[in-house]
Protein backbone atom coordinates (compact mmCIF):
# COMPACT_ATOMS: atom_id res chain seq x y z
CA UNK A 1 0.00 0.00 0.00
CA UNK A 2 1.26 3.44 -0.99
CA UNK A 3 0.84 6.56 1.13
CA UNK A 4 -0.76 9.08 1.00
CA UNK A 5 -4.14 7.46 0.29
CA UNK A 6 -6.44 9.29 -2.12
CA UNK A 7 -10.05 9.43 -0.89
CA UNK A 8 -11.11 12.65 -2.61
CA UNK A 9 -12.45 11.30 -5.91
CA UNK A 10 -15.34 13.78 -5.86
CA UNK A 11 -12.79 16.60 -6.25
CA UNK A 12 -11.05 14.97 -9.20
CA UNK A 13 -9.91 11.58 -10.46
CA UNK A 14 -6.60 10.46 -11.86
CA UNK A 15 -6.78 9.90 -15.61
CA UNK A 16 -7.22 6.19 -16.36
CA UNK A 17 -4.08 4.77 -18.01
CA UNK A 18 -6.17 3.56 -20.96
CA UNK A 19 -7.49 7.09 -21.44
CA UNK A 20 -4.05 8.69 -21.25
CA UNK A 21 -2.68 6.21 -23.78
CA UNK A 22 -5.49 6.99 -26.21
CA UNK A 23 -5.04 10.75 -25.82
CA UNK A 24 -1.35 10.55 -26.71
CA UNK A 25 -2.27 9.53 -30.26
CA UNK A 26 -3.92 12.92 -30.89
CA UNK A 27 -1.12 15.36 -30.17
CA UNK A 28 2.02 15.04 -32.28
CA UNK A 29 2.88 15.11 -36.00
CA UNK A 30 2.71 11.29 -36.02
CA UNK A 31 -0.80 11.36 -34.57
CA UNK A 32 -4.21 12.74 -35.47
CA UNK A 33 -3.47 16.39 -34.69
CA UNK A 34 -5.76 18.15 -37.21
CA UNK A 35 -8.49 20.68 -36.56
CA UNK A 36 -11.90 18.97 -36.86
CA UNK A 37 -13.24 22.15 -38.49
CA UNK A 38 -10.73 21.78 -41.37
CA UNK A 39 -13.06 20.28 -43.95
CA UNK A 40 -10.69 20.35 -46.92
CA UNK A 41 -8.12 17.68 -46.03
CA UNK A 42 -7.55 14.33 -44.38
CA UNK A 43 -6.03 15.76 -41.18
CA UNK A 44 -9.29 17.56 -40.45
CA UNK A 45 -11.47 14.63 -41.49
CA UNK A 46 -9.61 12.22 -39.19
CA UNK A 47 -9.90 14.62 -36.27
CA UNK A 48 -13.60 15.11 -36.97
CA UNK A 49 -14.13 11.36 -37.03
CA UNK A 50 -12.38 11.01 -33.66
CA UNK A 51 -14.66 13.70 -32.20
CA UNK A 52 -17.73 11.96 -33.64
CA UNK A 53 -16.72 8.66 -32.03
CA UNK A 54 -16.28 10.39 -28.64
CA UNK A 55 -19.62 12.15 -29.03
CA UNK A 56 -21.26 8.76 -29.57
CA UNK A 57 -19.47 7.22 -26.57
CA UNK A 58 -20.76 10.00 -24.32
CA UNK A 59 -24.30 9.77 -25.74
CA UNK A 60 -24.28 5.97 -25.28
CA UNK A 61 -23.58 6.24 -21.55
CA UNK A 62 -26.57 8.51 -20.91
CA UNK A 63 -29.10 7.24 -23.46
CA UNK A 64 -28.92 10.30 -25.70
CA UNK A 65 -28.46 11.05 -29.40
CA UNK A 66 -24.90 12.11 -30.31
CA UNK A 67 -26.34 15.28 -31.90
CA UNK A 68 -27.51 16.32 -28.42
CA UNK A 69 -23.96 16.54 -27.03
CA UNK A 70 -22.22 19.94 -26.99
CA UNK A 71 -18.57 20.02 -25.89
CA UNK A 72 -17.49 22.65 -23.35
CA UNK A 73 -14.44 23.35 -21.19
CA UNK A 74 -16.01 21.56 -18.23
CA UNK A 75 -19.12 21.26 -16.08
CA UNK A 76 -18.85 24.84 -14.78
CA UNK A 77 -19.13 26.14 -18.33
CA UNK A 78 -21.90 23.64 -19.08
CA UNK A 79 -23.87 24.95 -16.08
CA UNK A 80 -23.33 28.54 -17.23
CA UNK A 81 -24.33 27.78 -20.82
CA UNK A 82 -27.43 25.84 -19.77
CA UNK A 83 -28.73 28.34 -17.22
CA UNK A 84 -27.76 31.64 -18.86
CA UNK A 85 -28.44 30.26 -22.34
CA UNK A 86 -31.96 29.07 -21.51
CA UNK A 87 -32.80 32.08 -19.33
CA UNK A 88 -31.81 34.54 -22.06
CA UNK A 89 -33.54 32.62 -24.84
CA UNK A 90 -36.84 32.12 -23.00
CA UNK A 91 -36.99 35.39 -21.02
CA UNK A 92 -39.95 36.66 -23.04
CA UNK A 93 -42.00 33.79 -21.54
CA UNK A 94 -41.08 34.58 -17.95
CA UNK A 95 -38.21 35.50 -15.68
CA UNK A 96 -38.56 33.05 -12.80
CA UNK A 97 -35.94 30.36 -12.10
CA UNK A 98 -36.18 27.57 -9.51
CA UNK A 99 -33.17 25.91 -7.89
CA UNK A 100 -31.99 24.52 -4.54
CA UNK A 101 -29.73 25.91 -1.79
CA UNK A 102 -27.42 22.88 -1.94
CA UNK A 103 -26.50 23.20 -5.63
CA UNK A 104 -22.87 23.58 -6.72
CA UNK A 105 -21.50 27.13 -6.78
CA UNK A 106 -21.42 26.96 -10.60
CA UNK A 107 -25.22 26.87 -10.50
CA UNK A 108 -25.80 29.18 -7.52
CA UNK A 109 -23.43 31.92 -8.70
CA UNK A 110 -24.86 31.75 -12.23
CA UNK A 111 -28.33 32.24 -10.74
CA UNK A 112 -27.04 35.16 -8.64
CA UNK A 113 -25.72 36.77 -11.84
CA UNK A 114 -29.13 36.36 -13.49
CA UNK A 115 -30.74 38.00 -10.45
CA UNK A 116 -28.52 41.03 -11.09
CA UNK A 117 -29.90 41.02 -14.65
CA UNK A 118 -33.48 41.18 -13.44
CA UNK A 119 -34.45 37.49 -13.18
CA UNK A 120 -36.15 36.20 -10.04
CA UNK A 121 -34.70 33.06 -8.45
CA UNK A 122 -36.30 30.84 -5.79
CA UNK A 123 -33.78 28.83 -3.74
CA UNK A 124 -35.52 25.80 -2.21
CA UNK A 125 -34.38 24.43 1.13
CA UNK A 126 -33.84 20.65 1.16
CA UNK A 127 -35.14 18.40 3.93
CA UNK A 128 -32.78 17.39 6.76
CA UNK A 129 -31.61 14.36 4.73
CA UNK A 130 -30.66 16.57 1.77
CA UNK A 131 -33.56 15.53 -0.45
CA UNK A 132 -36.00 17.95 -2.05
CA UNK A 133 -39.63 17.58 -0.98
CA UNK A 134 -41.51 17.10 -4.26
CA UNK A 135 -44.63 18.81 -2.91
CA UNK A 136 -42.59 21.90 -2.01
CA UNK A 137 -40.96 21.81 -5.44
CA UNK A 138 -44.34 21.61 -7.14
CA UNK A 139 -45.68 24.47 -5.02
CA UNK A 140 -42.71 26.65 -5.99
CA UNK A 141 -43.35 26.26 -9.74
CA UNK A 142 -45.15 29.25 -11.26
CA UNK A 143 -46.63 29.96 -14.71
CA UNK A 144 -43.59 32.20 -15.39
CA UNK A 145 -41.01 29.62 -14.20
CA UNK A 146 -38.98 29.18 -17.39
CA UNK A 147 -36.16 27.10 -15.88
CA UNK A 148 -35.47 24.76 -12.97
CA UNK A 149 -31.95 23.61 -12.14
CA UNK A 150 -31.52 20.67 -9.75
CA UNK A 151 -28.39 18.55 -9.38
CA UNK A 152 -28.57 14.76 -9.63
CA UNK A 153 -25.92 13.88 -7.02
CA UNK A 154 -24.61 16.38 -4.50
CA UNK A 155 -20.84 16.89 -4.57
CA UNK A 156 -20.51 17.11 -0.78
CA UNK A 157 -23.04 14.67 0.65
CA UNK A 158 -23.61 12.45 -2.40
CA UNK A 159 -27.40 12.59 -2.04
CA UNK A 160 -29.35 11.61 -5.17
CA UNK A 161 -32.40 13.68 -6.08
CA UNK A 162 -35.41 12.10 -7.79
CA UNK A 163 -34.80 13.73 -11.17
CA UNK A 164 -37.41 11.51 -12.84
CA UNK A 165 -40.21 12.90 -10.68
CA UNK A 166 -38.85 16.46 -10.71
CA UNK A 167 -38.57 16.31 -14.51
CA UNK A 168 -42.20 15.27 -14.84
CA UNK A 169 -43.32 18.19 -12.65
CA UNK A 170 -41.28 20.57 -14.83
CA UNK A 171 -42.62 19.08 -18.07
CA UNK A 172 -46.21 19.47 -16.84
CA UNK A 173 -45.49 23.13 -16.09
CA UNK A 174 -43.70 23.71 -19.44
CA UNK A 175 -40.53 24.54 -17.48
CA UNK A 176 -37.10 23.76 -18.95
CA UNK A 177 -35.32 21.30 -16.62
CA UNK A 178 -31.54 21.45 -16.21
CA UNK A 179 -29.69 18.77 -14.26
CA UNK A 180 -26.09 19.07 -13.07
CA UNK A 181 -24.98 15.44 -13.35
CA UNK A 182 -21.27 16.10 -12.80
CA UNK A 183 -21.03 13.72 -9.84
CA UNK A 184 -23.52 11.07 -10.94
CA UNK A 185 -22.77 10.36 -14.59
CA UNK A 186 -21.06 6.97 -14.94
CA UNK A 187 -21.85 6.13 -11.31
CA UNK A 188 -25.63 5.88 -11.54
CA UNK A 189 -27.77 4.58 -14.37
CA UNK A 190 -29.00 7.55 -16.45
CA UNK A 191 -31.23 7.01 -19.47
CA UNK A 192 -32.36 10.30 -20.95
CA UNK A 193 -34.89 8.54 -23.17
CA UNK A 194 -36.88 7.85 -20.00
CA UNK A 195 -36.29 11.14 -18.18
CA UNK A 196 -37.92 14.52 -18.76
CA UNK A 197 -34.53 16.25 -18.60
CA UNK A 198 -33.90 19.03 -21.13
CA UNK A 199 -30.33 20.04 -20.30
CA UNK A 200 -27.64 18.06 -18.46
CA UNK A 201 -24.12 19.12 -17.47
CA UNK A 202 -21.27 16.63 -17.46
CA UNK A 203 -17.57 16.64 -16.65
CA UNK A 204 -14.67 14.50 -17.82
CA UNK A 205 -12.28 14.67 -14.86
CA UNK A 206 -14.85 13.34 -12.38
CA UNK A 207 -14.90 10.11 -14.41
CA UNK A 208 -11.17 9.39 -14.99
CA UNK A 209 -10.89 11.60 -18.06
CA UNK A 210 -8.74 14.74 -18.49
CA UNK A 211 -9.47 18.10 -16.86
CA UNK A 212 -10.52 21.04 -19.00
CA UNK A 213 -13.27 19.35 -21.00
CA UNK A 214 -16.94 18.66 -20.35
CA UNK A 215 -20.23 18.47 -22.19
CA UNK A 216 -23.77 19.74 -22.12
CA UNK A 217 -26.66 17.55 -23.24
CA UNK A 218 -29.25 19.66 -25.11
CA UNK A 219 -32.51 17.86 -25.89
CA UNK A 220 -33.71 17.78 -29.52
CA UNK A 221 -37.25 16.42 -28.99
CA UNK A 222 -38.94 18.47 -27.60
CA UNK A 223 -36.33 20.91 -28.82
CA UNK A 224 -34.55 23.16 -26.35
CA UNK A 225 -32.98 26.39 -27.56
CA UNK A 226 -30.05 28.24 -25.98
CA UNK A 227 -28.44 31.60 -26.49
CA UNK A 228 -24.67 31.15 -26.78
CA UNK A 229 -22.37 32.70 -24.17
CA UNK A 230 -19.17 32.22 -26.21
CA UNK A 231 -19.18 33.59 -29.75
CA UNK A 232 -16.84 32.90 -32.64
CA UNK A 233 -16.64 30.46 -35.50
CA UNK A 234 -20.01 28.87 -34.81
CA UNK A 235 -18.65 25.51 -33.65
CA UNK A 236 -20.96 23.04 -31.87
CA UNK A 237 -23.98 24.18 -33.90
CA UNK A 238 -23.40 27.76 -32.78
CA UNK A 239 -23.86 26.93 -29.09
CA UNK A 240 -20.18 26.92 -28.18
CA UNK A 241 -17.56 28.45 -30.47
CA UNK A 242 -13.88 27.55 -30.22
CA UNK A 243 -11.58 24.97 -31.80
CA UNK A 244 -12.37 21.57 -30.33
CA UNK A 245 -9.53 20.13 -28.19
CA UNK A 246 -9.49 16.74 -29.92
CA UNK A 247 -7.14 14.98 -27.48
CA UNK A 248 -9.28 16.01 -24.49
CA UNK A 249 -12.53 15.08 -26.22
CA UNK A 250 -11.13 11.67 -27.21
CA UNK A 251 -10.04 11.20 -23.59
CA UNK A 252 -13.50 12.06 -22.31
CA UNK A 253 -15.10 9.68 -24.81
CA UNK A 254 -12.83 6.81 -23.82
CA UNK A 255 -13.44 7.51 -20.12
CA UNK A 256 -17.21 7.37 -20.69
CA UNK A 257 -16.87 4.17 -22.74
CA UNK A 258 -14.93 2.49 -19.91
CA UNK A 259 -17.47 3.70 -17.33
CA UNK A 260 -20.33 2.18 -19.33
CA UNK A 261 -18.52 -1.16 -19.55
CA UNK A 262 -17.41 -1.35 -15.92
CA UNK A 263 -20.24 0.38 -14.03
CA UNK A 264 -22.15 -2.82 -13.22
CA UNK A 265 -19.15 -4.36 -11.45
CA UNK A 266 -17.51 -1.20 -10.09
CA UNK A 267 -20.43 0.34 -8.22
CA UNK A 268 -21.17 -2.71 -6.00
CA UNK A 269 -17.43 -2.90 -5.24
CA UNK A 270 -17.37 0.75 -4.16
CA UNK A 271 -20.56 0.35 -2.14
CA UNK A 272 -19.00 -2.56 -0.23
CA UNK A 273 -15.90 -0.46 0.49
CA UNK A 274 -17.96 2.59 1.48
CA UNK A 275 -20.08 0.45 3.84
CA UNK A 276 -16.92 -1.07 5.31
CA UNK A 277 -15.65 2.45 6.02
CA UNK A 278 -18.98 3.49 7.51
CA UNK A 279 -19.20 0.40 9.72
CA UNK A 280 -15.67 1.05 10.94
CA UNK A 281 -16.40 4.65 11.89
CA UNK A 282 -20.01 4.61 13.11
CA UNK A 283 -19.07 3.23 16.54
CA UNK A 284 -17.03 6.33 17.34
CA UNK A 285 -19.09 8.32 19.84
CA UNK A 286 -20.97 11.40 18.60
CA UNK A 287 -20.62 10.76 14.87
CA UNK A 288 -23.34 11.74 12.44
CA UNK A 289 -23.77 10.86 8.77
CA UNK A 290 -24.74 13.86 6.68
CA UNK A 291 -27.41 13.25 4.06
CA UNK A 292 -29.62 10.28 3.26
CA UNK A 293 -27.82 6.91 3.33
CA UNK A 294 -30.59 5.35 1.25
CA UNK A 295 -30.59 7.77 -1.71
CA UNK A 296 -26.89 8.30 -2.11
CA UNK A 297 -23.91 7.66 -4.36
CA UNK A 298 -22.23 4.35 -3.51
CA UNK A 299 -18.85 6.10 -3.35
CA UNK A 300 -19.66 8.92 -0.91
CA UNK A 301 -19.52 9.12 2.88
CA UNK A 302 -19.82 12.45 4.67
CA UNK A 303 -19.54 12.28 8.45
CA UNK A 304 -19.42 14.88 11.21
CA UNK A 305 -17.31 14.05 14.27
CA UNK A 306 -18.76 16.21 17.04
CA UNK A 307 -16.31 18.14 19.26
CA UNK A 308 -13.52 17.83 16.71
CA UNK A 309 -12.54 20.69 14.41
CA UNK A 310 -12.70 19.49 10.80
CA UNK A 311 -9.59 21.43 9.81
CA UNK A 312 -7.50 20.04 12.68
CA UNK A 313 -8.79 16.56 11.88
CA UNK A 314 -7.63 16.94 8.29
CA UNK A 315 -4.20 18.03 9.53
CA UNK A 316 -4.06 14.93 11.72
CA UNK A 317 -4.87 12.82 8.65
CA UNK A 318 -1.80 13.83 6.67
CA UNK A 319 -1.60 10.38 5.07
CA UNK A 320 -5.16 10.53 3.75
CA UNK A 321 -6.50 12.91 1.12
CA UNK A 322 -10.04 13.80 2.15
CA UNK A 323 -11.92 17.08 2.20
CA UNK A 324 -14.15 19.16 4.40
CA UNK A 325 -16.66 20.92 2.20
CA UNK A 326 -16.25 21.03 -1.59
CA UNK A 327 -12.84 21.46 -3.24
CA UNK A 328 -13.92 24.72 -4.85
CA UNK A 329 -14.78 26.27 -1.51
CA UNK A 330 -12.69 24.28 0.99
CA UNK A 331 -9.94 26.92 0.82
CA UNK A 332 -12.23 29.19 2.85
CA UNK A 333 -12.80 28.46 6.51
CA UNK A 334 -16.55 29.05 6.26
CA UNK A 335 -18.63 26.04 7.29
CA UNK A 336 -20.12 24.18 4.33
CA UNK A 337 -23.22 25.95 3.02
CA UNK A 338 -24.57 22.53 1.97
CA UNK A 339 -24.46 21.23 5.54
CA UNK A 340 -25.88 24.49 6.90
CA UNK A 341 -28.81 24.11 4.47
CA UNK A 342 -29.52 20.68 6.03
CA UNK A 343 -29.91 22.45 9.36
CA UNK A 344 -26.58 21.46 10.95
CA UNK A 345 -25.19 23.89 13.50
CA UNK A 346 -21.81 25.54 12.89
CA UNK A 347 -19.96 23.09 15.14
CA UNK A 348 -21.21 19.96 13.35
CA UNK A 349 -20.77 21.56 9.93
CA UNK A 350 -17.18 22.45 10.84
CA UNK A 351 -16.43 18.93 12.02
CA UNK A 352 -17.44 17.18 8.80
CA UNK A 353 -15.17 15.08 6.62
CA UNK A 354 -16.06 13.93 3.11
CA UNK A 355 -14.64 10.58 2.00
CA UNK A 356 -15.13 9.78 -1.68
CA UNK A 357 -13.93 6.45 -3.05
CA UNK A 358 -12.97 5.49 -6.57
CA UNK A 359 -11.51 3.08 -9.09
CA UNK A 360 -8.15 2.66 -7.32
CA UNK A 361 -9.43 2.44 -3.74
CA UNK A 362 -8.58 -0.86 -2.00
CA UNK A 363 -9.82 -2.66 1.10
CA UNK A 364 -6.39 -2.24 2.67
CA UNK A 365 -6.63 1.54 2.27
CA UNK A 366 -10.07 1.59 3.88
CA UNK A 367 -8.88 -0.41 6.90
CA UNK A 368 -5.86 1.87 7.30
CA UNK A 369 -8.17 4.89 7.15
CA UNK A 370 -10.51 3.50 9.82
CA UNK A 371 -7.65 2.94 12.26
CA UNK A 372 -6.10 6.33 11.58
CA UNK A 373 -9.45 8.10 11.98
CA UNK A 374 -10.19 6.42 15.30
CA UNK A 375 -6.81 7.44 16.70
CA UNK A 376 -7.03 11.00 15.39
CA UNK A 377 -10.52 11.65 16.73
CA UNK A 378 -9.59 10.23 20.14
CA UNK A 379 -6.40 12.31 20.30
CA UNK A 380 -8.10 15.57 19.31
CA UNK A 381 -11.01 15.03 21.69
CA UNK A 382 -8.54 14.44 24.51
CA UNK A 383 -7.32 18.00 23.89
CA UNK A 384 -10.81 19.48 23.75
CA UNK A 385 -12.30 21.12 26.87
CA UNK A 386 -15.71 20.95 25.17
CA UNK A 387 -15.44 17.16 24.96
CA UNK A 388 -14.64 17.00 28.70
CA UNK A 389 -17.68 19.15 29.47
CA UNK A 390 -19.88 17.01 27.23
CA UNK A 391 -18.63 13.84 28.97
CA UNK A 392 -19.45 15.43 32.33
CA UNK A 393 -23.02 15.81 31.13
CA UNK A 394 -23.01 19.58 30.65
CA UNK A 395 -25.40 20.74 27.91
CA UNK A 396 -23.17 23.02 25.87
CA UNK A 397 -26.14 24.70 24.20
CA UNK A 398 -27.19 26.23 27.51
CA UNK A 399 -23.85 27.90 28.23
CA UNK A 400 -23.60 31.66 27.77
CA UNK A 401 -20.07 32.30 26.47
CA UNK A 402 -18.81 35.74 27.43
CA UNK A 403 -16.36 37.67 25.29
CA UNK A 404 -13.33 39.03 27.14
Swiss-Prot record:
Pathway in which this enzyme or protein is active: Cofactor biosynthesis; iron-sulfur cluster biosynthesis
Residues recorded as bearing N6-(pyridoxal phosphate)lysine in the entry: 206
GO cellular component, one term: L-cysteine desulfurase complex
Residues annotated as the enzyme's active site: 328 (cysteine persulfide intermediate)
Reactions it catalyzes: (sulfur carrier)-H + L-cysteine = (sulfur carrier)-SH + L-alanine
Primary location group: cytoplasm
Residues that coordinate or bind [2Fe-2S] cluster: 328
GO biological process, one term: [2Fe-2S] cluster assembly
Binding site for pyridoxal 5'-phosphate: 75-76, 155, 183, 203-205, 243
MF GO annotations: 2 iron, 2 sulfur cluster binding; cysteine desulfurase activity; metal ion binding; pyridoxal phosphate binding
Pfam family, one: Aminotran_5
Family: Belongs to the class-V pyridoxal-phosphate-dependent aminotransferase family. NifS/IscS subfamily.
Protein name: Cysteine desulfurase IscS
Organism in which the protein naturally occurs: Haemophilus influenzae (strain PittEE)
Amino acid sequence: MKLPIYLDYAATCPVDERVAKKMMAFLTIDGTFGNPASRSHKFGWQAEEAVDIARNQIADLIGADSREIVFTSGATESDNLAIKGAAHFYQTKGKHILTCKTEHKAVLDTCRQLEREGFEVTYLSPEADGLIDLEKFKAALRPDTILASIMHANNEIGVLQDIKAIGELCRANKTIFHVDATQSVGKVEINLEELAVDLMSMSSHKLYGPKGVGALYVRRKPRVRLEAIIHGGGHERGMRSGTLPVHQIVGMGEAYRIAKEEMASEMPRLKALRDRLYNGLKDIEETYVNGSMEHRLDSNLNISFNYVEGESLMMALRDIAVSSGSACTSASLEPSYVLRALGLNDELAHSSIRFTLGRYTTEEEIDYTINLMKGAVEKLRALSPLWDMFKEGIDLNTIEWSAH
